Design a protein with these regions (language model features):
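N-terminal basic, amphipathic alpha-helical segments
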Residues: 1-130, 333-337
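Residue-level detector of conserved, well-ordered beta-strand and adjacent loop positions
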Residues: 67, 110, 220, 297, ...
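Short, solvent-exposed loop/turn segments at secondary-structure junctions
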Residues: 112-116, 178, 202, 249-251, ...
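A general structural signal for well-ordered alpha-helical segments in protein cores
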Residues: 121, 151-152, 330
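Conserved core of the PLP fold type I
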Residues: 133-273, 284-302
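Short, Asp-centered acidic motifs that coordinate Mg2+ and/or phosphate
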Residues: 241-243, 275-276, 306, 321
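Glycine-centered flexible beta-alpha turn that most often forms the glycine-rich phosphate-binding loop
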Residues: 280
C-alpha cells in the first residue's frame, strides 16, 4: 500500500470512529507531514482521497474539515415486479441514446466513460504511439483464440486485486466487456432460455439478451444490498432459469456495492439450483475503497461464475480490450468466440 493510501486509511479510520466529529478541523497538511514523516504532496494526496470519499472537505485558507452531517433523502423502495419472464423491448429508447452525436462541451451522462481529455492519459497515448511506430507485420495478424499471452498474464495479475486467483490460461481476451457478456450468455444459454437480471439493469446487457433471443426475468434490486436473494430464490423455484446476470460492484445504474456476505449467499444459491452466474465487473475498479471490492468469482470454487471485465471504464473505451474468466464453460466460450 502506498504512503498516501496508508495515511488516508489511518485518518479515515479516526474520522469514522468519531475521534473527529462533523465540523471539526483536521490537522494541517504541514502538521500531518511532520507527524508521519512524509512529504507535503503525500499528505495532499491523502486528503484528496478522503475528499473523494466524503470524509473531508477543504475550506479556502482554513484547511480541511470533517463535513457536517447531511440529511440523506430516503432511498427508493424496491419495485413490485411481475415474476414472469418477458421479452425485452427497449430498441427505440436505446437507439435514441446511442444515436446522439457526442458534443465536446456536454458531459455525456447517458454513457459511463472516463474523461479521455484528462492529462493522466498522456502516458497511455505516448505508449500507444511508441508501439505503433515499432510494430511490424505480426501486429496485423490474428492472435490465438485466447488472445495475447502477455496481455492475459497482465490481466491475471490485475485480477488479484479483486481476490480472484486466476492464471493466464484461465483468461480469454475479448473486444470489450460487451462481447464478453454476449459470449457468456451464448455459452450457457440457448435462444428462448430465461436469464434472471437485476431490475433496474444496464440497457446494454438487456440488448445483448434480446439480440440473442433470451427472455429476462426481472428480480427486484435495492441500492444498498443489491439483488433480492429472497425474490431470486422464489424465481429459481418457479422457473427454469439458466443464468443469473449481475453487476455486484459499483452497479450501473444503482451504484451499490453488494456486501461480501451477500455475494457468498448469491453464489450458494446458484450452486443449490445449479445455475451459472454471469458477473459484469467493468466498474469494479472505480470503488473508493482499498482494497477494491472482491468479485463473486473470487469465492467461486466450482467454476460456475463467468467473470467479465474491460479497460473501458478505467482507461478509455476506444481501446476495446475486454476479458473473461469463464471457468467450467471455457470450452463452450472458445467455441462461441
Amino acid at each position: 500500500m502506498t504512503l498516501y493510501l496508508q495515511l488516508a486509511e489511518t485518518l479515515g479510520s479516526r474520522i469514522e470512529q468519531g475521534l473527529y466529529r462533523p465540523g471539526d478541523r483536521l490537522p494541517s497538511v504541514r502538521a500531518m507531514s511532520i507527524e508521519h514523516g512524509v512529504s507535503l504532496s503525500t499528505v495532499q494526496q491523502a486528503y484528496r482521497l478522503l475528499e473523494d470519499r466524503g470524509l473531508a472537505e477543504p475550506r479556502p485558507k482554513s484547511g480541511y474539515f470533517v463535513p457536517a452531517a447531511r440529511q440523506m433523502p430516503p432511498l427508493p423502495a424496491i419495485a413490485r415486479l411481475a415474476q414472469r419472464p418477458v421479452e425485452i423491448s427497449q430498441w427505440e429508447q436505446v437507439l435514441a441514446l446511442v444515436s446522439t452525436v457526442p458534443r465536446p462541451d456536454v458531459v455525456q451522462l447517458g454513457r459511463g466513460m472516463p474523461d479521455i481529455s484528462s492529462p493522466s492519459l498522456k502516458p497511455l497515448t505516448r505508449s500507444l504511439a511508441r508501439l505503433n511506430r515499432h510494430a511490424d507485420a505480426r501486429a496485423l495478424a490474428y492472435d490465438g483464440i485466447h488472445g495475447s499471452p502477455l496481455l492475459r498474464e497482465e490481466v491475471a495479475r490485475l485480477l488479484v486485486d479483486s481476490g480472484c486467483r486466476a492464471t493466464a490460461s484461465d483468461v480469454v481476451i475479448t473486444t470489450g466487456c460487451h462481447e464478453a457478456l454476449s459470449v457468456s450468455i451464448r455459452a450457457v444459454c440457448e435462444p428462448g432460455d430465461i436469464v434472471a437480471v437485476e431490475s433496474p439493469s444496464f440497457h446494454g446487457a438487456m440488448q445483448s439478451l434480446k439480440g440473442l433471443g433470451m427472455k429476462a426475468l426481472e428480480i427486484p434490486t435495492d441500492p444498498v444490498n443489491g439483488i433480492s436473494l429472497e425474490a431470486l430464490e422464489l424465481a429459481l423455484e418457479q422457473w427454469p432459469i439458466k443464468a443469473i446476470q449481475v453487476t455486484p460492484n459499483c452497479n450501473n445504474p444503482l451504484g451499490y456495492i453488494m456486501p461480501e456476505s451477500r455475494k457468498r449467499a448469491l453464489l450458494a444459491l446458484a450452486q443449490r439450483y445449479d445455475v451459472a452466474i454471469i458477473e459484469d465487473d467493468v466498474y469494479g475498479d472505480l470503488a473508493y475503497t482499498y482494497p477494491r471490492p472482491r468479485t463473486i468469482k473470487s469465492y467461486d470454487d466450482d467454476g460456475r461464475v463467468l467473470l467479465c471485465g474491460s479497460f473501458s471504464k478505467v482507461l478509455a473505451p476506444g481501446l476495446r480490450i475486454g476479458w473473461m474468466v469463464p471457468g467450467r464453460y471455457a470450452d463452450r466460450v472458445l467455441h462461441m468466440k
